[in-house]
Amino acid sequence: MFRSRKSLRYATSAAALTLLLSVVPSAQTNGSAERYVATAVNMGQPGPTGPWTVEMVVNRWATDGQRDTLMQVLLSKGPNDLLKALQEMPRAGYIRTPDTIGYDLKYARKMPLEDGGEQVFLATDRYIGFWEAVNRPRTFDYPFTYVELRVGPDGKGEGKMSIFTKIGVDKKKNQIVLENYGTVPVLLQNVRKETKS
């Protein structure tokens, strides 16, 4: 039964990540860096209770080719090989809080919204500490960190960050979203977008 449950988790993760990578792309350019700053509020996930500041900087947006390569790896080899492929990707930017040196973002993609704003998708491999690697709690089966931001034309918005939870699909928009967008553990408030030169 444990093996069956684990297989189900892998299949669910694989399906969700396939949809993340197949988002209808906007122009993915590598111009000026884009910086997003938000106030994070922990909604029940292990870790700091917040609020705290999160900075996300994107220096490189994923190309269609990179997206296609990751999709092919996921479809043909599964989530473990997708994790390896993601880890081998060049740095797309970083995510950090004021008290950390930050973590590299490996995948960054954005698409336009109907109101003139944008939806930003960020993904990276999640740091797994010694205790977690040895004891393999349920969180060990979710090695990805995923961020979704919705930013208006005025550069302000909101978002969610998923560290130990799953992602899902918005079939109407044919895009990946955080599963249960309204109840994900880390809420990103007061998102502000800045362009760095």
Ranges and model annotations:
Residues 11-22:
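Bacterial N-terminal signal peptides
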Residues 23-28:
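Sec/Tat signal peptide C-region and signal peptidase I cleavage site
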Residues 7-13, 85:
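Short amphipathic alpha-helical "recognition" segments used for binding
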Residues 29-197:
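Long, low-hydrophobicity ectodomains and other hydrophilic envelope-associated domains
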Residues 1-7:
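N-terminal secretory signal peptides that target proteins for export/translocation
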